[in-house]
Amino acid sequence: MRKKTIVDGLEISYIEEGEGSPVLLLHGWGCNGGHWKAVIEGLKADHRVVAPDIPGFGESEEPPETWTTADFADFFEHFLAAIEMQDPVIIGHSNGGRISMMLASRSLARKVILTDSAGIKPHHSASYYAKVYSYKAMKKALSLPLLRDKKEAILDKYRGKTGSADYNAASPGMRRIMSTVLGEDFIPVLKQIKVPTLLVWGSEDTATPLSDGETMESVLKENGVDTALIVFEGRSHFAYLEECPRFISICKAFI
C-alpha cells in the first residue's frame, strides 16, 4: 500500500506491507521504492516491510539543498521515528547501501544486507580526471560576462556527451547531490558498524564492482563484525532482481 507522510518538511512516499519484525528497503540512484516490489512480496508474510522513495526520487520531494549521505541518514532516522519503526533489518542497494551503512553505524539497525552497494570511493582513470578538470575550466570560462547567457546550454550539451545516464537524467539539485555523495569514502563508516552485515553481489557488476564488496567484507571482518559475502555468478549491478527468488531466500534466512 502506498502511503505518504511529512518528515523534516518534505513529503515522502513509501510502500508498506505486512506485519511482524521490521524491514526497511532503501533503493539505489534513479530507482524508487517500487523497484523492491518482488522482494516486498517475498517478505511481507512474516515482516512489516517499508520501502520509501528516497527524497528526490519517485513520488518523494527533492531535498531543498545539497545533501550528503549523513543528511539522508538524518532524514531516515526521523522517518523511522515518524512511522514508529524500531531496530529494523535494513536492506540497501547501490546508493541506498550508503544510507544503510550510515544508519547502521548509528546503531539504528538490527542487521544489514548490502546488495551491490556503493560506498567504496572509485579509482578513476586519467581520462576521467581530464574530463572533470576540463568541465571545471569550461564552467569557469563560461562565467565571463560575454558568455554567461549561453552558459547552461553549453554545459548541458557537454554533460550530455560525458555524464552518466543517471547524472544526465537528474535535476540540477540532484546532480549536485550525486557529485557530493560519489566523493564520500565509507571505510570510516564501515569501521563503526557492529551489527551482523550480509553482502550480496553480482560478479559482473560494473557500477560497484565485486572488489568493492570484497573490500567491505575485509573491513568488517577486521573489526569483528559477523559478515559474509555471497556472490551471484554472472549477475550485474541488479543481482537482487536478476535472481530475486534466491535473494529473498537468503534474506529470510539472514533476518
Model-derived regions: residue spans:
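Active-site loop/oxyanion-hole signature of alpha/beta-hydrolase fold enzymes
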Residues: V7, S13-I15, A51-I91, S249
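Short beta-strand/loop motif that positions the catalytic acidic residue
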Residues: I193, L199-W201, D205
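Flexible "cap/lid" loop of the alpha/beta hydrolase fold
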Residues: R98-S105, A109-S143
